[in-house]
């Protein structure tokens, strides 16, 4: 396989909302393909008509595109092994089943679940042991008798009588002893192929060389290797792919992150204002690291460094605080003009309007780029620029406004009313002269009431720049209105 082009696949089922574990798997496959100069194949496993949905399929496409994980073959782009939706490949799967039956690699099984349990009980075994390989050696007469009863057989693969061992690229040598895995079903009674068949068959037909997937699928690997061995013997494929089982992603405590956990929902992170660079960087750290002292890296740097053999086999815990911190770093790394574009797009998607022209919006964006963790934080800092969204927080008012603030507000109003140029340096100079020098106040005492009056909060972008953006009229109106704040009640409107 060393001279063969690396081909990996990402094959989600279109059910529910894309979750971070699924996307981590996609990322590791994508990065390995790009690192090796190979192909990233995207295949949809839509074999469960009762659970699959077009909405979920479109959500997966949306997720991959938003993150920039492009695929070389698959839905929307095509490729040499079309179709890439398993529901459209049934005839290919049935043909492999036919060949397996003809070669004696598989057989028809008529036993019901109740009959299997009864045989286990009669032999003093646990009735929940699973299939007992009873139908392996049925005679043609016995099969005919079952058909005469109206029974529809499933097709089962004959498991080998030897140990199944593979060198897992993450976990090392892994062995399942002979006899541990019973003969397993490849089809339903109506002949429809099952996931246990279609997944490895499609991997074989699409010449997948490496299977990178979650460790929850490790128990199915001996079955798949046995099926591969059978497919080699009947000429469907000529090799078995390398397997790498990625570590579980844990949530709180030692519990595996569930699809029901909010932090597992990819789109909730996007809605909060994660940017692709930040989220991908964090997901990469769930089982892999680029260096012991280097947690912040780009996707290009990951591609250069990524080798699946470096993935850690220990479970990885999803730490929201660390994810947030990494996202904040990537927001800071954006070029200013790129940050403006991202923030404007985010605000538009969430119905946030500041009422600023392009140049003023760029100034506002610059004020918050180093002060936010996710894009959503920017609205909380900048919404004071929208008169409809502006409101004085009662807690902030109780802390900073009231009778003691009146001299400060009056001095500020007097200093600002006489300004000829409404610029940040002029505003800063006038206020420092009036409050720091004139009233001999410390900066916090001088500017705390002004910040709450102008922005409605104790935490805001830089005060003087905020006043310039707000404009002289609205700034002075808010300062005047703040004088009337008594006992948590005051005029918060901008109409004088």
Curated annotation (Swiss-Prot):
Nucleotide-binding among keywords: yes
Residues noted as binding ATP in the record, renumbered to the chain: 259
Domain of life assignment: Bacteria
Catalytic reaction(s) noted: tRNA(Glu) + L-glutamate + ATP = L-glutamyl-tRNA(Glu) + AMP + diphosphate
One GO cellular component, as annotated: cytosol
Principal location listed in the UniProt entry: cytoplasm
Pfam families: Anticodon_2, tRNA-synt_1c
EC number: 6.1.1.17
InterPro entries: aa-tRNA-synth_I_cd-bd, aa-tRNA-synth_I_codon-bd_sub2, aa_tRNA-synth_I_cd-bd_sf, Glu-tRNA-ligase_bac/mito, Glu-tRNA-synth_I_codon-bd_sub1, Glu/Gln-tRNA-synth, Glu/Gln-tRNA-synth_Ib_cat-dom, Glu_tRNA_lig_a-bdl
UniProt-annotated location(s): Cytoplasm
Keyword field: Aminoacyl-tRNA synthetase, ATP-binding, Cytoplasm, Ligase, Nucleotide-binding, Protein biosynthesis
Gene Ontology BP terms: glutamyl-tRNA aminoacylation
Residue window of motif 'HIGH' region: 12-22
Short motif ('KMSKS' region): ranges: 256-260
Molecular function per GO: ATP binding; glutamate-tRNA ligase activity; tRNA binding; zinc ion binding
Assembly mode: Monomer.
Record-stated family: Belongs to the class-I aminoacyl-tRNA synthetase family. Glutamate--tRNA ligase type 1 subfamily.
Function according to Swiss-Prot or TrEMBL: Catalyzes the attachment of glutamate to tRNA(Glu) in a two-step reaction: glutamate is first activated by ATP to form Glu-AMP and then transferred to the acceptor end of tRNA(Glu).
Protein name: Glutamate--tRNA ligase
Higher taxonomy: Bacteria, Bacillati, Actinomycetota, Actinomycetes, Mycobacteriales
